[in-house]
């Protein structure tokens, strides 16, 4: 009995040969799964990244009995990308709190100073006093402050840009309710490094375009 089990046989008890298993269905299933997996990976790798659109800022409140508040002319992202950013030590930035979160302007001003911006100040936003700026925020500047605005825009790339009538080179960063922290990645760091004292290489226009194409 043991010998028969050990030796085995190719026939059943009626003397008929055992049927061999057909491997074709298993091969078909495996091939199908391989194809499906390849298609899924191809779609995942070739799909363009989702680009988050920043919320449009609400207009400023209009005080009764006074002239309407004018933010200035909104500047397009395309036009601003062509502006070369200023050296960080030459910047004059005012961080304005319009988010309703106490102390946020001071925190962001400190973070800007850590990056190399020259002694940013912090205060409440007089334009949105008594209300909140429901968006990422706004960068407001005059003609003399365009380069500073371009440097500031590197770390606040989702803000709206407004060219106003101020004559000096100061720039306001008004923080909205959606603003959480300054932007940070390897490309931004590379550009900021070229804007610090001692740097001799100019900012790379292609890198600037890449930063602002992928931010919002």
Curated annotation (Swiss-Prot):
Pfam families annotated for this entry? LytR_C
The record's subcellular location field reads: Cell membrane
Question: Which Gene3D superfamilies does its entry note?
Answer: 3.30.70.2390
Residues crossing the lipid bilayer are: 25-45
When this gene is knocked out, what is seen? Loss of the gene results in increased sensitivity to nitric oxide (NO) and lower growth rates at low densities in rich media. The mutant has substantially increased sensitivity to two distinct antibiotics that inhibit peptidoglycan cross-linking (vancomycin and meropenem) and to rifampicin. It also shows increased cell envelope permeability. The mutant is highly attenuated in mice.
Q: Which UniProt keywords apply?
A: Cell membrane, Membrane, Transmembrane, Transmembrane helix, Virulence
GO CC annotations on file: membrane
Q: Which domain of life is it from?
A: Bacteria
UniProt topology in membrane: Single-pass membrane protein
Q: State the NCBIfam families in the record.
A: integrity_Cei
> What exactly does this protein do?
Contributes to cell envelope integrity and virulence.
Would you tell me the protein name for this molecule?
Cell envelope integrity protein Cei
Q: Which organism is it from?
A: Mycobacterium tuberculosis (strain ATCC 25618 / H37Rv)
């Amino acid at each position: 009995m043991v010998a028969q089990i050990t030796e085995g046989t190719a026939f059943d008890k009626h003397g008929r040969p055992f049927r061999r298993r057909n491997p074709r269905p298993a091969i078909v299933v495996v091939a199908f799964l391989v194809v499906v997996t390849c298609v899924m990976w191809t779609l995942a790798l070739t799909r363009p990244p989702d680009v988050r659109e920043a919320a449009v800022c609400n207009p400023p409140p209009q005080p009764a009995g006074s002239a309407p508040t004018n933010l200035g002319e909104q500047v397009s992202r395309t036009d601003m990308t062509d502006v070369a950013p200023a050296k960080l030590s030459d910047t004059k930035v005012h961080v304005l709190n319009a988010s309703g979160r106490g102390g946020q302007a001071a925190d962001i001003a400190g973070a800007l100073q850590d990056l190399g911006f020259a002694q940013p100040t912090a205060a409440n936003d007089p334009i949105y006093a008594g209300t909140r700026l429901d968006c990422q925020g706004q960068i407001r500047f005059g003609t003399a402050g365009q380069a500073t605005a371009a440097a500031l825009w590197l770390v606040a790339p989702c803000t709206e840009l407004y060219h106003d009538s101020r004559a000096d080179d100061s720039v306001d960063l008004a923080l909205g309710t959606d603003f959480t922290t300054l932007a940070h990645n390897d490309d931004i760091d590379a550009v900021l490094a070229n804007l610090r004292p001692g740097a001799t290489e100019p900012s790379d226009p292609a890198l600037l375009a890449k930063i602002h194409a992928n931010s919002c």
